[in-house]
Amino acid sequence: MTDGSWVRARPLWARWPWNAVFGASLIALAGGLLWWMLNTSCGDGVRRVGPDGQCVGVTDGKYHYTQNVAKVSALIRKENRAVEQEESKNGTPYVSIVYLMPMVPDEKDSNTVDALRHELQGAYAAQYDANHHFSNGDVPRIKLLLANSGSSAEQRSAALDEIRKRIEADRIVAVAGLGTSTNATKEMIRKVTRPRSEGGLELGAVGAVLTADTFDEVEGLVRVAPTNSDEAAAAAAFLQSKEYAGKRVLVVQDSKPDDQYTRTLSQAFLKALPEKRRFARVEQYDSSQAGSATNFKALMANLCTYKPDVVYFAGRGVDLPKLLAPLRTRICNDRPLTVFAGDDVSQSPQAAGFDEILETLRDGNVELLYTGLAHPGAWKLAEGAYPTEGAFGEKGSYRKFFRNDQLDDGQAIMGHDAVTTAVSAIRLEGGTAADQKVSGSMMMQRWKSLHGVHAVAGASGLISLQNNGSPERKAVPVIEIGSDGIVRTVAVSANGGDPLTRKDLAG
């Protein structure tokens, strides 16, 4: 107070100028955070969803979910544009297939980034051949859309909502791929195939690598992979061969509650193998719990007491290094041991821990076999079961676009066959009339026509669909991962021992 009047204090920002800078920074930061929260778009049809902000939705290939799939996404985008331009110019109709799966796997996923890329490459090769080679007819042409289902219920729901919005505009009739055999996957597929009157999408669904037997329950779903029962029966048939006849088997199973793959694989193998050939006790572990490596060490210590000749591993490939590591230094490693697994092990050579696997194979007197879904080495071992190499032959479209990528994990072949199966049903329904329309409900009716003379000539073997949507006597390659890291097919088996051939279908 001066001369009876109050003097206003200088503002804090004026007394300390740096406070103004600090305040402006806070405002900018808050504004940026608000913008990020409000602007969830990643691209056309794709947006950030969930706490991790993963980009989920549907793209025609313009948006790349990761750099890992950038090249194949760009090729799909180019082919889709060509299909649209052909309709504009010549009136040639098209329909769309959505390839739906988790597109951004992390280190906990059973799917590797290489396997994901290969699967999409195979899907693209099938799209390209459908639009350029016409072995399954020529109309309608095929667009391929890529949908990321993410890793949570919220993200899966967002992806399905985006598909729903685009059904009419993009003429979507089928969803392919679909991921792996989990409870979450099954529920997602039910929403895909359920009638629209019940809140579903009412689209045909074709799984690429779904093997759990429980997926037979899903109406409107077919799959191109052998079921776990088929894989287990094929493994049991292989173990009846001269080299393995009489050898005793110990089963090790992942008891993770929501993994239908591991549970049904174990159940099917126990049913397929004669009781006298196996130990009564099934050794279990739970991969969803901490300390699985310690559990494997304790579990494997019992091997020298049990003295099995074969360990049948009903688990995920991501856990294989932890299973094998204790075998390298077991007391009884003078006794040879065969570890036999299911198809999920096909991705182990691309995953973390493969060097540890090779160390055990080199030093632990261990042989590693698995029943695969597809492998190029099978084509020469059982030619009658494999009517065509198709896109994967030396002059095929896969080699044209992805010559440097390997086929050993089988994912490219399975992605290709899933899309080829959808195309076969589309063209069977669409025929040659350019104005005949195909719908999702029509697709679900046509799935069961794909048998006999209409069986699909897949690169993974003949796909003759049964009424439950699973392929009949699908070829199952028995594959070895050698101590040198080389992956080779050693036999081709099937449920019942012999895979389906064209001669069988001809009567």
Question: Could you describe each region identified by the protein language model?
Answer:
Residues 1-96, 479:
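Long terminal accessory regions outside catalytic cores
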Residues 93-122, 127, 249-254:
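Short beta-strand segments enriched in small/hydrophobic residues
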Residues 116-118, 133-214:
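Beta-alpha junction/loop-to-helix N-cap segments that form part of ligand/metal-binding clefts
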Residues 167-180, 199-208, 250-253, 303-323, ...:
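Periplasmic-binding protein-like
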Residues 206, 213-237, 355-374:
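Short beta-strand elements at the ligand-binding edges of bilobed clamshell
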Residues 217-288, 323:
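An alpha-beta-alpha
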Residues 330-416, 493:
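Extracellular/periplasmic periplasmic-binding protein-like sensory domains
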Residues 401-409, 423-491:
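Segments of small-molecule ligand-sensing domains
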